[in-house]
Amino acid sequence: MSNEIVAKRYAVALFQIAKEKHVLEMFEEELGLVQSVFMKNEELHSFLTKPNISKEQKKMFLSNVFSSVSESILNTLYILVDNKRIEILPAIANEYVTLANEERNVADATVYSTRLLSEEEKLNIAEAFAKRTGKDAIRVKNIVDEDLLGGIKVRIGNRIYDGSLQGKLARIQRELMKNR
């Protein structure tokens, strides 16, 4: 079975537990924390995937490193160690966020701009795209892209809304070429 399918199954199980316990946000934050530590620390990843280190040692290590996370998240990490699938943790976290967002009718947007946006600008973008996408809310993450000449690009899921200067120039060029 592919890692993507397996990650989705783990995420669905965690999502169902979180929904039953009314802790969707808490699990999302904890998974984000675990994912962040896992992605930034190559030594942790290396340690957890070494075959010569016992599962018990790995679990003890995880319980020390992630002592602040809930029992359900920690147990999931233990199961991943037992099943030698710890490398799919980032995919599980991403899939969980997708499920939680669907439940709350929220979307995550990545906004690429030439400078950091103010909170008011982020709020305006969130409101405009919430209406456009039919979502109750949009959570905006701003990334400064030095390659942009001006304007913004907004990525929500698989969709990109290009309001950048390059995008506008490309559209004008296509129109001019089409009308020749």
UniProtKB/Swiss-Prot annotation:
Identification of the protein by name: ATP synthase subunit delta
Residues in coiled coil: none
Complexes and interactors: F-type ATPases have 2 components, F(1) - the catalytic core - and F(0) - the membrane proton channel. F(1) has five subunits: alpha(3), beta(3), gamma(1), delta(1), epsilon(1). F(0) has three main subunits: a(1), b(2) and c(10-14). The alpha and beta chains form an alternating ring which encloses part of the gamma chain. F(1) is attached to F(0) by a central stalk formed by the gamma and epsilon chains, while a peripheral stalk is formed by the delta and b chains.
Top-level taxon in the UniProt lineage: Bacteria
Membrane topology value: Peripheral membrane protein
Gene Ontology cellular component terms for the protein in this record: plasma membrane; proton-transporting ATP synthase complex
PROSITE patterns given in the database record: ATPASE_DELTA
Gene3D superfamilies, A to Z: N-terminal domain of the delta subunit of the F1F0-ATP synthase (1.10.520.20)
Family as reported in the entry's similarity comment: Belongs to the ATPase delta chain family.
Role summary: F(1)F(0) ATP synthase produces ATP from ADP in the presence of a proton or sodium gradient. F-type ATPases consist of two structural domains, F(1) containing the extramembraneous catalytic core and F(0) containing the membrane proton channel, linked together by a central stalk and a peripheral stalk. During catalysis, ATP synthesis in the catalytic domain of F(1) is coupled via a rotary mechanism of the central stalk subunits to proton translocation. This protein is part of the stalk that links CF(0) to CF(1). It either transmits conformational changes from CF(0) to CF(1) or is implicated in proton conduction.
NCBIfam families xrefs: ATP_synt_delta, PRK05758.2-2, PRK05758.2-4
